[in-house]
Amino acid sequence: MVKNNKISNSCRMIMSTNPNNILMRHLKNLTDDEFKCIIHRSSDFLYLSDSDYTSITKETLVSEIVEEYPDDCNKILAIIFLVLDKDIDVDIETKLKPKPAVRFAILDKMTEDIKLTDLVRHYFRYIEQDIPLGPLFKKIDSYRTRAINKYSKELGLATEYFNKYGHLMFYTLPIPYNRFFCRNSIGFLAVLSPTIGHVKAFYKFIEYVSIDDRRKFKKELMSK
């Protein structure tokens, strides 16, 4: 019985010090309108897609804040809450900063600390600047090869659109929404990266692929 109590107390301690649980305590009682304000303010700190503004959950938002700002998630949440004229005090112990994705050359070394947005941003830049790819980026580059074969006509139309308007802001990517949506979007935009520039390609990726879809793809990539 004493042993069970120790286990129970230990679990409660973990729950009370987990950054996700601490941040969630401040979000869980917000009204829908208040949460919408929080989401829009969060866009100053997080990469949100268009669909995230209507579909992101409190749990996903918290996970993204903790992942993007592991050392400052408490400060970021406090700043975000100022949009509601609320002054909150979040006491969270900091941890080591996540390792930049560019340092990882092989899939076996991938960890939870790597951000998919880092991988994609660096990958698009490498493609635009014709920088030799390491094994991890070669794995991602297979999606570009697939896109060339599968979307040759659509890629031509996207290039024509960009050459005419100088951007892809209002261009709808011809990628069907299914379990391959994230990887196909990466591949399609990677082909366009030398033409439109890696920055525009990256922001189109953020605009189109939601945080939830990015997380699902990251788990799939890490499981292989």
UniProtKB/Swiss-Prot annotation:
* UniProt KW Secreted keyword: no
Q: What is one Pfam family matched by this protein?
A: Poxv_Bcl-2-like
Induction text:
Expressed in the early phase of the viral replicative cycle.
Keyword annotations:
Early protein
Q: Which domain of life is it from?
A: Viruses
Q: Which family does it belong to?
A: Belongs to the orthopoxvirus OPG034 family.
Q: What is this protein called?
A: Protein OPG034
| Organism of derivation | Vaccinia virus (strain Copenhagen)
